[in-house]
Amino acid sequence: MAKNIQAIRGMNDCSPTESPLWQWIENKVRNVLAGYGYSEVRMPIVESTPLFARAIGEVTDVVSKEMYTFWDNDEQLTLRPEGTAGCVRAAIERGWIYNNEQRLWYMGPMFRHERPQKGRYRQFHQAGVEVFGIPNPEIDAELIILTARLWKELGIDQHVSLQLNSIGSLEARANYRSALVKFLENHTALMSDEEKERLVKNPLRILDTKNQALQEVLNDAPKLLDYLDDDSREHFAHLCHLLDAMGIAYEVNPKLVRGLDYYNKTVFEWVTSALGSQGTVCGGGRYDGLVEQLGGHATQGVGFAMGLERLVLLVQEVNKEINLPKAVDVYVVYSGEGATLNAFQMAERIRSELPQLGVMTHCSGGNFKKQFKRADKVEAQIALVIGESEVEQQTVVLKDLQSGAEQVIIAQADLIAELTKRF
């Protein structure tokens, strides 16, 4: 017997029993975004490696350690580790943002070579939003308000909380970086080798360290908010005022910097403790210099991404009231040579006139007992039974499989009206 080929570590299949919840969440995301007037875009999964190096930053963990990169002839390519860089590349290349505001969204798989754990995989899925050409804090507020609405739609709003910060301009951040490095140089004895490397290459990333001893020291470190330029300070104050007025609760977290180099001014994360240790469900911020950095005209940008695996786990954990639609509403069983054609014609008629229903026709043979077992297995609500006599009399037997009520015989001409009443 040939050896089974297994899925790659950290890359998972989605089974028929799991996919309805995924579809339910994805549809909620689509509907909320449509309600705010956002347009879907679709970008390639593979991009040129320099795109991510320039956008995300050479010294970030994502670029230096986590990307799936390969050579195609003389071109270095990478499976996308996130969606913003590719969306900005497409917006520049296709002219979507030339003298134009854009509110865009996308959904799909991303790839990072990191240690697989609950809710974090090597192939994972994100829904992302990118807004271009709007410098005002009102759009930052809209993105946060939009996500808050989505959490209510998903029934998880009581289990997520918003953390907010401003990391200012590049110049303000450079001044803060110098002050932070000067402070941390007195505490290198507490640092791991990796943290010492970060101190040299990307010191702001030390702010979100998991090192407990270093966390305590950081409580006395210089605060980024104290180094903000006037424009960033005013932008952040107006954002906070809008969120207060809209009743959006938040915590200003001075250690929040996000893991990608392109951010400036506003950064935010929605976090949860419902999955064990605190985890990020959604994160984003402003990236006003990224379009120009990647070769476009100076264009402000702001966006966020949410991890769908984390959302699936969170919804499963805290929302037990979901009524997921069944894949099969009506199961058509039949027996007899003449009944086969009649069954297929009837099923097609239902699909045409009641397209919201899932209709499955039995195709694997067997007696009625076997066919009903299959109908039960797929959890159909209604079974329609057609035999030779039903074909002759142009009737159909309707059996409610969920209630166990007595089966009824109805004219085939009345079937659509009867199903409309029941669904």
Curated annotation (Swiss-Prot):
Organism whose genome encodes this protein: Actinobacillus pleuropneumoniae serotype 7 (strain AP76)
GO biological process: histidyl-tRNA aminoacylation
Similarity comment text for this entry: Belongs to the class-II aminoacyl-tRNA synthetase family.
Catalysed reactions, as listed in the record: tRNA(His) + L-histidine + ATP = L-histidyl-tRNA(His) + AMP + diphosphate + H(+)
Gene Ontology molecular function, alphabetical: ATP binding; histidine-tRNA ligase activity
Keywords: Aminoacyl-tRNA synthetase, ATP-binding, Cytoplasm, Ligase, Nucleotide-binding, Protein biosynthesis
Complexes and interactors: Homodimer.
PANTHER family membership: HISTIDINE--TRNA LIGASE, MITOCHONDRIAL-RELATED, HISTIDYL-TRNA SYNTHETASE
Protein name: Histidine--tRNA ligase
EC numbers: 6.1.1.21
Coarse class of the protein's main subcellular location: cytoplasm
Compartment list: Cytoplasm
